[in-house]
Structure formats: C-alpha cells, structure tokens
Amino acid sequence: MILYPAIDLKDGNCVRLLHGEMDKATVFGTDPAAQAAKFEAAGCAWVHLVDLNGAFAGEPVNGAAVEAILARITVPAQLGGGIRDMATIERWLSKGLARVILGTVAVENPDLVREAAKAFPGQVAVGIDARNGKVATKGWATETDVLVTDLAQSFEDAGVAAIIYTDILRDGAMTGPNIEATEALGRAVTIPVIASGGVSSLPDLIALRDTGVIAGAISGRAIYDGALDLQAALAALKA
C-alpha cells in the first residue's frame, strides 16, 4: 500500500482544513515546494496535491505553487481541485503532473472522465468525496443523492487509474479513517482505491493495509502534527 503525503494549497500556502471548511484552515507552511521536497527526501513514492481554492472556484487557482512543486521533486505527483475540463487536464499533464484527480466533474460530466482516461491512460483518477455515504461536490459544498458505490462502479470500464475516496466528516479531524466504508468500496470495484480523510496514526495505516483491498492512503494533518511518523509509516508499509 502506498502512502501519499498531502499538500493542500490555499492562497499559495500549505494548509489543512477541518471537515473541508475553508474558514477552518491551519497553515502548516508557506513554502509548499520545500515541503514536497522534504516528503521526497523522507522516501515517499508519491505526493498528493490539492488546490483548495480551485475546488471552490471551479478552475485552477494555486497553479504557481503546483508548478514550483513539480520543479522541485522527481517523484510523481497527483493533483485535484478545480480540474473540470479537457484543456486543464492536458495542461497539467503536459507540465509534468503524473495524475489528475477529477471530482465534481465525475458527477456532473462523467463522459469527460471517460474521454480523459482514454486519452491519458493511467493518468486520470476519480475523486469521490462523501458525507454519510452520499457524494458531495464543488469543494464539498454541494451534497448529492448519488451513492459512493454507484458512482465508483459507473467508471469500472472507463480505464481510470484510481478512485480516491474521502470521508469528509473524518477529514482533518484526526479521528481515524472510515475503514469499513473504504473497504466496502474496495470490494465493490476492481479499480484501485486510495483512502483519504482521518488517517491519523500508524495503526490506521496498518488497518487499511490489512483489508487487502486498499491500494493507498493519503495523510496530511497527522504528518504535520507529528501524530504519524513518516519514516516509521513508510518502513511499516514496506515490511
């Protein structure tokens, strides 16, 4: 299982939100590129990036910070937040991003996901953000009646590289991930599932790994707070 350290970008800074609320942002650093380089130096195989302003605006906002990160690291990076059209997808992949994450657009325009996944094999992931099993969109501000498993299964034949599943109520709360729901999703689809939201300790990571159906886990606040020792986590996942 791959550990994806998260860099959430707001106004060019590295932050974490609580429950996805922009006014509950804690700034952890003002140099995201340096933070990404630290993650690579620690041995991380990937870096997970989120353009928070972009998720709310519906278009990329923290582009300069993302480009600075891509210039600093050699490991692959994935980015979500405000990527809602083919031109933006093409632009980011041409700039060296390894994978784009499509969230809101996966609900509103699933054909775009299919088109992008076909055009860029292995480089398009679907981000499914949920509250109580229902999908939320537009930076989590809009709730839908779409069920997580239904949305995920609708992309089974689309060729998407991964599904990034975030439990909004766990995100940034340090309460542990929703292992039950994430495992159920992992069993419901053949697409690799990456867990996000609430991963706050080494036991959380081990529990996710031990399901045998979760391909990766994203953690942010726990790493910055020191609750999750990056070196120990990477070593444990290699064991």
From Swiss-Prot:
Keywords, comma-separated and alphabetical: Amino-acid biosynthesis, Cytoplasm, Histidine biosynthesis, Isomerase
Catalytic activity field: 1-(5-phospho-beta-D-ribosyl)-5-[(5-phospho-beta-D-ribosylamino)methylideneamino]imidazole-4-carboxamide = 5-[(5-phospho-1-deoxy-D-ribulos-1-ylimino)methylamino]-1-(5-phospho-beta-D-ribosyl)imidazole-4-carboxamide
Cellular compartment(s): Cytoplasm
Pathway(s) annotated for this protein in UniProt: Amino-acid biosynthesis; L-histidine biosynthesis; L-histidine from 5-phospho-alpha-D-ribose 1-diphosphate: step 4/9
CC per GO annotation: cytoplasm
EC nos: 5.3.1.16
Keyword hit for Isomerase: yes
Biological process terms in GO annotation: L-histidine biosynthetic process; L-tryptophan biosynthetic process
Entry keyword annotation includes Cell membrane: no
Gene Ontology MF term list: 1-(5-phosphoribosyl)-5-[(5-phosphoribosylamino)methylideneamino]imidazole-4-carboxamide isomerase activity
Stored PANTHER family: 1-(5-PHOSPHORIBOSYL)-5-[(5-PHOSPHORIBOSYLAMINO)METHYLIDENEAMINO] IMIDAZOLE-4-CARBOXAMIDE ISOMERASE
Family under the similarity heading: Belongs to the HisA/HisF family.
Protein name: 1-(5-phosphoribosyl)-5-[(5-phosphoribosylamino)methylideneamino] imidazole-4-carboxamide isomerase
